Structures are given as C-alpha cells and as structure tokens.
Amino acid sequence: MWQPNECIIQLKSGKLLKFAGPFIEYESIDVPCLLLKNLDDFKLRILKPSVIEECSLTRSKEPILLKLQSEESFESYKSRFAVISKELEWERLSKAVIATEKIFQASTLPRLNYINTNDDRIIFSIQNNDLVFFGATPDEFLEISKDHIFTLYSVAGTSLTSSVDKLENEVSVSSMMNELKKFGINSVEITQSVARSGELYHVKSMLKFRANLSLLGSLIDAIYPPSTIFGYPIKNALRNKQFLMPPSGYGYYGSLVGVLGEFDDGLLFRSICLIRGLEVKNHLVRVIAGSGIVKNRSAEQEFEECQLKLKSILGSIGAS
C-alpha cells in the first residue's frame, strides 16, 4: 500500500510529463523526454489560485466526517528523531526532514477549496487508477521560461523570526547553490518572500539563473530530491530514510511531477513536489507532513510543527 509509481507519459496535448517517486532510481530526462509508459487513466491538473475553481473527487457537498484510524505516537516519532539528531551532531547531515502521518476513514470523498487556502501557490490534483494525491500547498520545484531562465524554489521554515528556522532556510538555499556551482552556474539572483500555506507561513526563496535547456535532465538528477523535503547531503539522508519516512512509507509524498510544453504564462517547463497533500484511496484519507530539522531543535518542537501542518492540510478540505 502507498507505493509510488514511476512513469513518463504523453498528454493528449503532446506535452510530456515525468512522475518519479522518492528514493527510486530513474533515468535522466532528455529534451524531448523519452516516453516510457502511457497511462490512459492518469490525470493531472495544475492550476493557480487565481483560477476560481473547486476540485471535487465527487460532486457531493455533504460535510466531510473523518474518523481517525491510525496515527504515529509521539514516542515513535521521538525515537526516530533521536537517531537523526545524532547524525546532525556528528555533522553527517546539515538538515533532515522527518515526516509523520494520520490515516482517516472518510464519510465522503474530500474536495479542495483552492482559493481560501493559498497565497500565490500552485495547486494540483493527480490521479492514478483509484489512488489520488491532491492538495493545495505543494512545493514549486523548478520552472523554465521561454527565454531559458531557470527558477529553483526553496520553501523552508515556519517562523518569520526564529534563528533556527532562518538557518533551515539558509541550508536549503546553500545546498542548491552548491549543486549549481558544479555546473559552472555562479550568477544566481536570489529573492525571498513569505508564502502562506493555510494557517502557516514559510520563507520562500527563488533562485533565478540562465542555462541551456539541455541541462534540464542533469540538473534534476543533481537537485532532486531537494533538501526541503528529505535532507542534505541527500546521500546521507538516503542512508537514513527508514528514520525519516512516515510509518506507512512515502507513497506519492515528495514525488516530482514535471510538465514540458508551452504554457500561457510563458513557461516551457514547470514542476512541483507533492507535499502538504492527501492520499485518498477507497475512502481512506492519509495525511502526511514533515518538518525540517537542524541542530538545537527538540522532538517536541518538531512533532508539534508536524501536527500544525497536518491540521492545516485537513483544513484545506473543510475538515479538522
């Protein structure tokens, strides 16, 4: 259950999409993309909050009643946190993201109200057979404009004043810069803003640079999975993934979805990482959230942050 798939599919419009689950090997993307598999029942929608639309898995307008089926205890989370804390102390990791979950039985399939839960964030729903991952606050990952301006996104930290959250964001940005320098990319414009995800606020950094489109596949191999979702250095995070992932596994959480084609807003490529969302299957709703960990944080603080994120996600479907 909750196992990710991997595919590159061709949409009816001719656009190509790559979907890769976390921690699984996949080939680099060439331009144009290699078509590996065509899934007729695979549906994807990527919209902006300015689009006035509500996405429903059913047309039901009934209140959504969720009955808790399972959740990770604090003691379980704390034991995983202790292992990762040692890795941070020994400087094997400069940042790690520990994810947790709650699983509910739903009375009706949930729907998302995109407009009321986001400020300037991409919104999406993705479906493969009877499993749906959808949410109102994923992370933008990489975009490329028609004039070959690349934009990398980093969203990290939930406090506007905390020095620890500031460090978390700095680690995320510097990890991307380190990878870009390996490609000889040294001229990078960095801008920061505050992004709202439900009731939470995050520091949002955008790294803009010019590069050849042929670098797309190599860049994705180098910077995905990003530190904002799993940790840094990523190789060391992978060695500890059993302590980072939620009890039921990652599923679609953290997976990369990219679309190559021409968009009305002047982009040639846009991609998102599937986080802060819900997995829905047979009226089971799984909510997953992770928190970025650096030195000098406690298990209590990080577990509480995860609970706030879980609550925010549930709020995006009108449940609590």
Please place each PLM-identified region on the residue numbering.
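Short, surface-exposed beta-strand-loop junctions and turns on beta-sheet-rich folds
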Residues: 16-17, 24, 158-159, 293-295
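Short coil/turn segments at secondary-structure boundaries
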Residues: 94-99, 125-130, 217-218, 234, ...
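Conserved hydrophobic core element of enzyme catalytic domains
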Residues: 213-320
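Contiguous alpha-helical scaffold segments within structured protein domains
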Residues: 49-75, 79-82, 104-105, 149-247, ...
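An N-terminal JmjN-like helical accessory module and its immediate linker preceding a catalytic domain
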Residues: 1-43
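An anion-binding catalytic pocket shared by soluble metabolic enzymes
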Residues: 2-6, 12-13, 98-169, 186, ...
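Terminal domain-start leader segments
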Residues: 1-15, 55-109
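N-terminal leader/transition segments
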Residues: 8-9, 44-54
